[in-house]
Structures are given as structure tokens and as C-alpha cells.
Amino acid sequence: MTNICIIATIIIYLVAMLLVGFAYSKSNNDSTDFYLGGRKMGPLVTAMSAEASDMSSWLLMGMPGLAYLTGIASPGWTAIGLALGTWLNWLIVARRLRRYSANLEAITVPQFLSLRFHDQRNLLNALGAVIIIVFFVPYTASGFAACGKLFHSLFGVDYMAAMVVSACVIVGYTITGGFRAVTTTDLIQSIVMSLALVAVLVYGIGAAGGWDAVVANAQSLPGYLTMLASHNAAEGTATSYSLLDIVSTMAWGLGYFGMPHILLRFMAIEDEKKLVLSRRIASVWVVIAMTASIIIGMVGLGMTKAGALEYLSGSSSETVIVRIANLIAQHGILAAVLAGLILAGILAATMSTADSQMLAAASSVSQNILQEFGHMKLTERQSLFAARLTIICVSVVGVVLARDPNSSVFGIVSFAWAGFGGAYGAVMLCALFWKRCNWQGALAGMLVGGLMVFVWKYLVSPLGGVFGIYELLPAFLISLLVCVVVSLVTPAPSKEIEAEFEAAK
């Protein structure tokens, strides 16, 4: 009966998401409607959609799992960097990008860069689209992996089968409803995610013997409850957390300036004046959600100490919320329904990011590669068909990449996040705030930044020491340097480009 209630709750939730997609299916009259919702998004939907699409499955799986194993330092500094990055992105990028993109009538991030620099060859369009596809596919795969882990660990359902079903639901409402469906479901999913965090915290603290017991257990573990050390569970010792480690984890915040699926939310709000309210909502929610996520990891370890939860090692630590939900479900029908909502919250975290990523990838192929770079003359209907076909292809490749049940959600997200921050972050800031920047500098910055993520991750980082820093930081800085240097040694932008820049201030 317990499993039936949980499964029924999850099915109802998934069907509701599909119905949202179908409800908006007839409102997509053109590409602007499908990709940006006609630039008619309200402040609440804009804020919560941006943050729900940002906080993927790592919020309810990766971050609690990291806190469970290593303590609060690594997830804590990461959360601080992300909170600062979120706030700065809303503060300095959102308004300028909304105004500039509307002036240029750009509906995708690569298209904005191409129009911003009057890139006649559409090289920025093509490179930007390729970068989005290269890094969004593994990012999407991490979401599918989270879905597979969820159902496999709870019901013993085949990992691959769970991924395929989850992918079909996400693809279903994304290809039918477009941006409006994605943002509306994101709002719903952010609420479900919040309820899941609260429910798990309340139950977990009680099962661990109370808050004092949770804290006492954390204090007894070397390096667990300090921001200057990391707990080594295997050896029962503390590892010093250096300044390099702090800078490396906080560097996550730089990624926000280059996240296409988040930047699209800024471009879609109905009135730039409402961005202030959106910023406040988004910033507060992010801080609360990440704090709760880290505490859940600590509470989960407290439950292990109390004998309420088995010890979770390696990537299985990412299922701590799933295990707690399973314990909640054993307390009756209503508790099982609540457990179903908690698990739906994990699905929500995954779906709210995956749908946005697939939509961004779809716009890159249909709008940026086929029409603008490839000069294909597509009708609105053909363009939307190409976009929907891209969504299906991305999901198929994502499922294939995530076929390993032992893959780390946090690890996959970390690399993809670095890719976007390194390739897009510095270039986007230069495009918005530096008038002397030109298309040559932007192109070089994107190319070098994207490549540097791979070079640093696989060639430089293994050297250890100072080179072990998170690849996003060196990629971002080198991209910025290359963008500035190349712009300065090549011809200055035309008077027309400078006039457009001034008009967007």
C-alpha cells in the first residue's frame, strides 16, 4: 500500500506537468513565443523559474550527499559563491540584458551576441550554439541520472527504464508548451522542492533524536562542522581547507554570468522595472534552499548515528533524501503521500533544469545553426519542428551518457557548469558593459574559455597543488584576458554598434 501511494502521487504530479504543456501548446504562434514566452513573464514566475532551472538535482541530491560525507565546508563555500553569483547576476546583468536583447530583437543568447557585435558571418551564433549543445547534453544527462537513482533506490525499478520514462515526461511538456510551459512548471516545481526540503528537515531532525543530537554528532567528527576543514569519512580525520579550496569552491558563482537557461529568463520578463522584485525573491529563495540542503546532509548523518538510517558511502550518499522519504512513507497513507511529494520534489529539481536546458539547446540548433549560420529559410512551423526534434535528440543522447548508475550527479553538473561559465561568462560581461569589445574578441574569448575547461580539467588539474583549482576560475579569467587583448588589437566597433551600446544603458 505504501509504494502504491507513493507511485500514485508521483504519477499524478507527472501527469499534471504534461497537462501544463498541453495547455500552452496552442499559444506558441512563433519562435519568440516558443523560446521566450513573448517576453510576457511576470516577476514571480521569472524569479522562481530562473532559480528552479538553476537548482537542478544537485540541490536535493548532490549537495546533501556532499555534506553527508565531508561536512559543511565544501558545500558551504560553494553555496556562498552561488548565492553571491545569483545576487550579482540579477543586480548587474538582468536589467541590461533585458533592455539590450529587446532592442536587438534577440531571442537566444548566441543570437544576442551575434547581433550585439554585428557578426555578419554568424560565427558567434554557430560557436555559441555548439557550446550550448556540448555542455547541456551532459548537464541534462545528470538530471536523468538523478531520476534513475531515485526510482532504483526506492522501488528497485530498473535504472535505465526509470530514466527513459522520466525523459519522456520532460520531453513531452517541453515540446508541446515551449517556454510558457517550462516557466509555469518551474514555478510549480520550485514550490514542490521547497515543501520537500521542509518535510525532510522536520522528520529527519526528529528521527535523529533532535537538533541537539544532530549538532553533537557533527561536532564529534573531525573537521565536519567547520568552514576551514573537510571531514574524511574513510579515515575519520580532518583535512585542512586551504584558501585555494575556498576560492575554488566559491568560483562556482562566476558560472551564473554564462548560464544560457538563466539568462533567457532575464530576456523574457515583461517589464525590466519588475526585475528588482524578481531579484529579491530569487536571492532569498536560493539562500534558504541551499542552507536547508546542506543541513539535510548533516541531519542524514545524525540519523545514521541514531541507527535510523544505514551508512551511505560514495555516490549512494546522494540518495539521502530518498532514503528519508522512504522512512516517512512507513507511517501511514498520508505519510506515504507526503513521501511521494518529497520524491516528486527531486523530480521537480531535475525536470525544472532539464526542460530549460533542452529548450536552450533547441533554440541553438533551430535558430542559431540552421537559420542564421546555415542560412536555411524555414517557416515558423518548420523552425518549431526543428526545435522539437532537437529536444528529442538531446534527451536520447543524455540518456545514453547517463547509463552508468554510479555516475555522480554533482561531478557531472560541476563540469558542465564550468563549461558555460568559462565560455560565456566573461564574454557576456564584456558584451554588456565594455563598449570597445568587438566580435573578434568575443569569438576568441568564447573559444578559448570553452577549450580551457577541458584542458584544465584533464591535463592541468591532475598535476595537483595550486593547479587542482576548479577549472571554472582559470577558464573564466583566461577567457576574459583573451577577449580584452584580442578586442584591443583588432579594429574598434563601428559607430552604429557604439550607438546601440549607449541606447541599452
Residue ranges of predicted features:
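Membrane-embedded helix-loop-helix hairpins and adjacent transmembrane boundary segments
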Residues: 1-505
